[in-house]
Amino acid sequence: MPFRFGTQPRRFPVEGGDSSIELESGLSSSASCTGKETSPNRQLRRCPGSHCLTITDVPITVYATMRKPPAQSSKEMHPK
């Protein structure tokens, strides 16, 4: 009998902020998703599929500095 891709439903790990009550009651995470979760320190937003959390209201400079160090200029790379 050949293996069929997708015969079992995909399961995602439980993340911090996920309610175990919703998971135990049998509700799917996408059905119970409100789009926003509140935290006393910061605002969290869940993607439509409830797979990831994003922090809202963070300046773009924070994301830019988190990505990678700035590239060196051509003068620094090729000294004379």
Swiss-Prot record:
It holds the Pfam family UPF0731. Residues 15-32 have a biased composition (Low complexity). Residues 1-45 are annotated as: Disordered. Transmembrane segments: none annotated. Residues 33-42 have a biased composition (Polar residues). Belongs to the FAM229 family. This is Protein FAM229B. It comes from Mus musculus (Mouse).
